[in-house]
Curated annotation (Swiss-Prot):
It comes from the Bacteria. InterPro entries: Rbsml_uS13_C (IPR027437), Ribosomal_uS13 (IPR001892), Ribosomal_uS13-like_H2TH (IPR010979), Ribosomal_uS13_bac-type (IPR019980). The gene is rpsM. This is Small ribosomal subunit protein uS13. GO terms for biological process: translation. One of its GO terms (cellular component) is small ribosomal subunit.
Amino acid sequence: MARIAGVNIPTAKRVVIALQYIHGIGPKKAEEITEKVGIPAERRVNQLTDAEVLQIRETIDRDYLVEGDLRREVSMNIKRLMDLGCYRGLRHRKQLPVRGQRTHTNARTRKGKAKPIAGKKK
């Protein structure tokens, strides 16, 4: 198994698919990386040379925010919104939907298990 950005990527899969196992790299970025390095799309990870793996690793480190750095960046952005006290920050702080979804009936995933109301039983 090749290890790129702290992730063991599967060897039997195509390079474009295997790169998507890294948090922060999707289909488009994986294709961009293979084009920059000059690897054919149908090449598999176990067919890569050590030099090609090194090129991929350097390209990702230089040009993309992945794994722990990306997670840290996202959490810092959310923390910044909460510190500002803006509407989105307040919604994050109260653990409610942030992007305008209704909460009267839905949003159970974000709000948690429904709390029973006493006195409604008959």
